[in-house]
A protein has these predicted regions:
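Oxyanion-binding/catalytic loops of NTP- or PPi-dependent enzymes
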Residues: 7-207
Length: 207
């Protein structure tokens, strides 16, 4: 994968990519970071540094270039993991204060919630009470992901579903989406509050 990413980057900038900085999740320890660095070297890359994704985010937004000092929070909800990190930033330096999260909480959980809702609505509409086969499951996941994205800008989204020779048009609203994923969002907020509280105990206030 790293070799492919480096190759794609080389094509984009029309220059060979050899020296790299690789990002990793905030919860990665020494063993995981070493394994990541080794993977980069196996891919033929010169790994200059392994840095955490929150640090990379702070660098990207230019926090370290600003004058003065500040404490910032990076909320990182990925496809399969969630991390929240508090960092103290000063000119030329980024220091991690604390980190929290859930390695099994991510966008996939939101997709699963939408899938379950759509499947339930489909069964109610058609009377189907069996299991979705592999093809129907894959189709359902793709449509759930698309519906989730569309609900960012729309109040409701219609979804055409097919399974076991049956077809039905079901609908999901933004309000319903918020309701079925509320527990997931609250979990991330609780982790965020815990990180903020721990940072405060250590003398740092987010501004």
């Amino acid at each position: 994968i790293l070799r492919k990413l480096a190759g794609d980057a080389s094509k984009l900038i029309v220059a060979a990519v050899k020296d790299v900085v690789i990002t990793c999740p905030a919860y990665f320890g020494t063993a995981e970071r070493t394994a990541t660095k080794n993977a980069g070297e196996i891919a033929g890359l010169n790994v200059i540094e392994i840095i955490s994704e929150p640090t990379a985010a702070a660098l990207y937004y230019g926090c370290a270039k600003e004058q003065g000092e500040k404490t910032v929070l990076v909320y990182d909800l990925g496809g399969g993991t969630f991390d929240v990190t508090v960092m103290h930033v000063s000119p030329g330096k980024i220091e991690m204060v604390c980190s929290d999260g859930n390695h099994e909480l991510g966008g996939k959980n939101w997709d699963d919630a939408v899938m379950q809702y759509l499947a339930s609505e489909f069964c109610s509409e058609t009377g189907f009470d069996g299991d979705f086969d592999e093809y129907a499951q894959q189709d359902l996941r793709l449509k759930a992901e698309k519906a989730k994205q569309q609900l960012s800008t729309r109040e409701k989204v219609p979804v055409m579903m097919d399974a076991a020779g049956l077809r039905a048009r079901v609908e999901i609203t933004r309000q319903t989406f918020d309701e079925i994923t509320e527990a997931l969002l609250n979990e991330s907020i609780e982790k965020t509050d815990a990180a903020i509280a721990l940072a405060a105990e250590r003398g740092y206030t987010i501004v």
